[in-house]
Structure formats: structure tokens, C-alpha cells
Amino acid sequence: MTQQTPDQYRVFGNPIEQSKSPAIHHIFADKSQQNIDYQKQLVDTKDFSNAVADFIRHGGKGANVTAPFKEQALAIADELTERATLAGAVNTLTFKNGKIFGDNTDGEGLVQDLITNKVILNESRVLLLGAGGAARGVLLPLLAQNPRSIVIANRTASKAATLCQHFSDIRLSASGYQDLEQQHFDVIINATSASLSGNLPPIPTSLLSQNVVCYDMVYGKDETPFLKWAKEHGAMKVIDGLGMLVGQAAVSFEVWRGVTPEVQPVIDKLRASLK
């Protein structure tokens, strides 16, 4: 009996060398008996749509998209999910019946990781740090978990206000970092890239207490500066973004293959490889 040719998937980005997506998807495929081949592909910043078209021509079934191409992926999609439209970005493309379908699984990945870590979002007061693409990408799935309120805080408060208007939900409000002093939150999510450069968002330590959960979308071998700071100032629980990375990949895999993969073994494996 001849081995069937595996279905082809890609992750497009620039840079792309650091991507863990191929490893994650191959573990998912292995555990769920799915015959796929998933590779990373470096794409010139001006050549994204050509790279996608070329991949489709060669029989590609789907692709993940990472920086700096998520907005371009949105532009080339023929059809979009609501979460992709509101996120203003696409990280998952499916090629079917001559059409390109765009989705965004980042927010779902975050929410699933919070739930796995037993973080209660229902009726919680959530503080979302940052008003860029990462924050925008997770708002719809966060709102679907029925929080009491979400405050979007940003260095430039007007940018946070614009994001609130974009979603027009009464549970959303905007703030500058300097205006957070007297406020209380149950969950603080860092959607800034500050941790990547070893920095902290300038937020007051008065926000932290024994009842606060702090989540950083960034992850690494060591605890991120934000989580280290949160722990030092008494946060109840700190969680990094590795589970979100695996979670958003799992949702993409499900979109493509119709199979829900187990995420915990993959998180454990990646965590061990970071050590």
C-alpha cells in the first residue's frame, strides 16, 4: 500500500527562524494520526501575496501567518471570520474551493490557556496592557467570557480609546498608565512587547495583591520581567505566553483538520526544551 502524500502547511514570517510552529503542529499530527507536512518559510516583506499564491499553486492546504504579515493576510482573504475582522489581522489561512479563508486564533489561544490555568474570567475585572495588534486580537474572545469589565491601558490613552470605540462594548474603557493608581483588577494581561526588550510597562505596584493573576503574552527560558515584577509584589499567580502559543496553534489545527489536539503534552515538551 503506497503512503499518501502529506497535506502541505506553512508558517510565513520575517524573521521566521525562531518559530516553534512546525514542531507544535507535527506533534499534534503525530498524536492525532494526521498526515501533514508543516514547514516554516521566510518571506520577503514585499512578497507575501506572491508567496501565498505560489504555495496554493503547489497544492498548499493552509498556512499560519506571523509578523509582519498578519494585516496583509487579512487583505488577501476572500472570506473572514468575525474574530479576524474585529482583530484586524489574520494568523490562519485555509485554502479551499479556490478561495482563501482568513481566521485569527490568537484570542482563543489566550482564553483556553487562562481556562486551563483555572483563571476565572466570568465577572472578573480585567486590565489589558497595550492597545496594539496583540491587544486587539484577543478582545473578542475575552469579551465572550463575560468579564465584568476590561480596562485597556496604554502609554497613549487615545490609542486605547480608539480600540474601545472599535469594539463598542459597554464593558470596555480606556486609560493611560498613570491613571491606574486607585483601581482594582482580578486579572492583568500584558499585551505589550515590553518583556521582549527586558522592560516593564510603567504601571503602579498598587495594582498587585494576593488576589491578582498576571499573564504575559511573551514567554522565554526565564521568567519575563513583567511576571518577575508581579511575583515580587505579591501577585497570586503568574503565567507566561507559552500556553497561548500552543493554544492558538491548536485552534488553527482544528480549523484545518477537524480534530482537537491535546495541548498540555506539547506545552510540557516545549517548556522542557527551553530549559
Swiss-Prot record:
Record keyword NADP present: yes
Database matches in Gene3D superfamilies: Leucine Dehydrogenase, chain A, domain 1, NAD(P)-binding Rossmann-like Domain
EC number: 1.1.1.25
GO biological process, one term: aromatic amino acid family biosynthetic process
Transit peptide in keyword set: no
Pathway, per record: Metabolic intermediate biosynthesis; chorismate biosynthesis; chorismate from D-erythrose 4-phosphate and phosphoenolpyruvate: step 4/7
Residue positions binding shikimate: 19-21, 66, 91, 106, 219
Pfam families the UniProt entry points to: SDH_C (PF18317), Shikimate_DH (PF01488), Shikimate_dh_N (PF08501)
Family annotation (InterPro entries): Aminoacid_DH-like_N_sf (IPR046346), NAD(P)-bd_dom_sf (IPR036291), SDH_C (IPR041121), Shikimate_DH (IPR011342), Shikimate_DH-bd_N (IPR013708), Shikimate_DH_fam (IPR022893), Shikm_DH/Glu-tRNA_Rdtase (IPR006151)
Catalyzed reactions per annotation: shikimate + NADP(+) = 3-dehydroshikimate + NADPH + H(+)
GO cellular component: cytosol
Amino-acid positions noted as binding NADP(+) in the UniProt annotation, renumbered to this chain: 82, 130-134, 154-159, 217, 241
Top-level taxon: Bacteria
Leading EC class: oxidoreductase
Sorted UniProt keywords: Amino-acid biosynthesis, Aromatic amino acid biosynthesis, NADP, Oxidoreductase
Catalytic residues identified in the record: 70
Record-level Gene Ontology MF annotations: NADP binding; shikimate 3-dehydrogenase (NADP+) activity
Entry-linked PANTHER family: BIFUNCTIONAL 3-DEHYDROQUINATE DEHYDRATASE_SHIKIMATE DEHYDROGENASE, CHLOROPLASTIC (PTHR21089:SF1), SHIKIMATE DEHYDROGENASE (PTHR21089)
Biological function: Involved in the biosynthesis of the chorismate, which leads to the biosynthesis of aromatic amino acids. Catalyzes the reversible NADPH linked reduction of 3-dehydroshikimate (DHSA) to yield shikimate (SA).
Oligomeric and partner information: Homodimer.
Family membership: Belongs to the shikimate dehydrogenase family.
Name the record gives this protein: Shikimate dehydrogenase (NADP(+))
Species: Colwellia psychrerythraea (strain 34H / ATCC BAA-681)
